[in-house]
Amino acid sequence: MNLQKINYQKELEKLLTRLEKEEKVPTLLLHSCCAPCSSYVLEYLSQYFKITVFYYNPNIYPESEYTKRILEQQKLIEEMHFRYPVSFLAGKYDRDRFYEMAKGLEEVREGGSRCMGCYELRLKESAEIAVAGGFDYFTTTLSISPMKNAQKLNEIGQRVGEEYGVQYLLSEFKKKNGYKRSIELSGIYGLYRQDYCGCEFSYKARQAEKRV
């Protein structure tokens, strides 16, 4: 399959239309990178799925930042209103797994092979949890970011889904003004919006930019 030509948003819309016609409400394990990015995705997908938000981000640095972000995620879920149930599941904050994956890639630019490995690490854990929990689908909020390559994310997600035996929900949440809406929702709910992706390497790069 040539994923280069796939319009992920249209593929998602086709599925959602079919689910409505069949009057089905599947279960979805939604990997969330942070509360702001999840805000629009939850507003959108909770119209069609029973969702469990899976917060698994061992890349986040420092630990105080991890704590801040996970608390914001829980706060958002508690305050938003959904058509179908949305629950929360915290993954293990296992930084060693991230650093093991990133070994030798410390100097790679953001958006390169280190980031691809980070996506795969988090999506594999998500797929494993989805299988164990009997979920119909799994996906991630990551494609809402203008900085994230939706094609790469979907390629990794599909491959991981095939490996683990669970359906990956194709998506490009930045489409249809998804990113803009996430900013609006962040304001409505008073969410903390970080200025770096999450890992130690992106944190240090951001600090260096601020010093210029």
Residue ranges and their predicted role:
Residues M1-Y40, L45-V212:
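Nucleotide-activated chemistry modules centered on ATP-dependent adenylation/adenylyltransferase
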